[in-house]
């Protein structure tokens, strides 16, 4: 099993003893921004999706123990139009916006935890 060094040791999944080894053989943990860029590129350019929505569970802001977060994801990717995040259990009263690699404002939203809040977001499509 390979692990990206950006993941802190406490965040690296320990599967030994939880899952039979044959069931996780070959599992590779990769850098989220790279994977997000690759998948978003396929969705936008190959599959011709109008909107790419990222559902993440990496937390929304960086801290010294965990540089991998939604802000980092947005600022290091192309082709993602909206990010709905989780993990930090944050509730945003207003949508936050961060610029992606193309300088486009990307909305980021989190709706707390335990299903207490249900969020909505209206997207407007403009024909190009």
Question: What annotation goes with each model-predicted range?
Answer:
Residues 1-128:
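Acidic, metal/ion-coordinating pockets
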